Amino acid sequence: DKDYLSTRIAYKLNLTGPALTIQTACSSSLVAVHMACESLRSGECSMAIAGGIGITFPQTGGYLYQKGMIFSPDGICRPFDAEANGTFAGNGFGIVVLRRLEDALVDGNTIIAVLR
């Protein structure tokens, strides 16, 4: 069940603290990162894992274009392209591990990016 995915992952990885499943349609991943950053800023936690996942299971349906909807007429997604004409749903995930910069520097963690 999608509502328990974050809790099951936290349990399997022996993580402590809140495990939240956030559902805000297209903004879920960004809201998860925002909430993780707020928890870090407030001192509620010293590390957070945030991200998003989109999986359609089982794959039983095909692609159906309907004029006036958000899906691309040719089934191709062209983000940031002048020829962009809609989106296409697919499976994927993205996860980030977040820490306060000063803590990551002290511990010698590899830093890929800094959120401000």
Regions found by a protein language model. Give the residues of each.
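Condensing-enzyme catalytic core of the thiolase-fold
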Residues: 1-116
